[in-house]
């Protein structure tokens, strides 16, 4: 794609550029210009790199959180959290992830109820998960334990276009970044597996509750973005 011209490096095959930024990143003096990653929009990394031990301990500290404070994360906190996902690797540097953030407690409860209804329908249809879903429903409906939405003050749905064959793997990469970053800004996360499975199954009552879902998109991941309980 790149070759050395009379005035420096040039792009010989513009259509083949995926805007990965590698050509710009490797320049030791920051002199390389690329129209997809222009110099004026670049942010140099000035902090010292983590040493091996610090990086190892940082990766080990990742934990799922399933008990949350009732306080709803602010828009600023959520923006910080979702912004870091832009730097996650995606197939062909496609990015293309969309997010639906839900902070309305009534709607979160309605989503959990819809998932419970879906489980009942799956049980009636003889699903392979029949026994597991029956156990979940006994906890959720008989004992009042919210093991579906975990009483989370906030839900974040990751969306990808239906024709995007790498949407699920892209979302998983993005969430991995978010999960590692969340504790640094006082947030905790966990995968909402039951809601995710229901959404991926295309259960219409759940889809109807996601008013912000763009056309021609599908749910690939659902995750809580919420405040961690301390102590």
Show which residues each predicted segment covers:
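Glycine/small-residue-rich phosphate/adenosyl-binding loop
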Residues: 100-171
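Short, conserved, surface-exposed binding loops centered on an aromatic residue
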Residues: 91-93, 144-151, 181, 213
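Iron-sulfur cluster-binding cysteine motifs and their immediate structural context
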Residues: 1-10, 22-39
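N-terminal, charged amphipathic alpha-helical interaction modules
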Residues: 87, 93-96, 107
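Extended interfacial segments that mediate partner engagement and assembly in macromolecular machines
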Residues: 45-79
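C-terminal helix-cap and adjacent tail motif
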Residues: 48, 139-143, 212-231
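Short Fe-S-cluster ligation motifs
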Residues: 14-31, 53-61
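Small-aliphatic-rich amphipathic alpha-helix that forms the alpha element of a beta-alpha
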Residues: 62, 81, 85, 156, ...
């Amino acid at each position: 794609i790149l070759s050395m011209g009379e005035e420096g490096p040039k792009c010989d095959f513009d259509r083949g550029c995926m805007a990965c930024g590698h050509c710009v990143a490797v320049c030791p003096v920051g002199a390389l210009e690329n129209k997809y990653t222009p110099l004026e929009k670049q942010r140099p990394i000035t902090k010292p790199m983590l040493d091996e031990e610090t990086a190892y301990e940082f990766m080990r500290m990742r934990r799922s959180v399933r008990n949350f404070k009732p306080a709803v994360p602010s828009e600023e906190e959520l923006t910080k959290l979702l912004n870091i996902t832009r730097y996650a690797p995606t197939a062909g540097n496609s990015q293309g992830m969309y997010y639906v953030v839900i902070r309305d407690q009534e709607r979160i409860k309605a989503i959990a109820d819809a998932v419970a209804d879906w489980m009942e329908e799956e049980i009636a249809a003889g699903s392979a998960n029949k026994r597991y879903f029956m156990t979940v429903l006994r906890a959720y409906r008989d004992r009042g334990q919210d093991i579906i939405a975990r009483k989370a003050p906030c839900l974040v749905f990751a969306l990808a276009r239906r024709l995007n064959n790498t949407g699920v793997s892209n979302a998983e990469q993005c969430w991995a970044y978010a999960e590692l970053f969340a504790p640094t800004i006082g947030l905790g996360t966990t995968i909402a597996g039951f809601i995710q499975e229901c959404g991926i199954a295309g259960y219409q009552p759940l889809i109807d509750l996601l008013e912000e879902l763009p056309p021609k998109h599908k749910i690939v991941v659902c995750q809580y973005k919420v405040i961690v309980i301390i102590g």
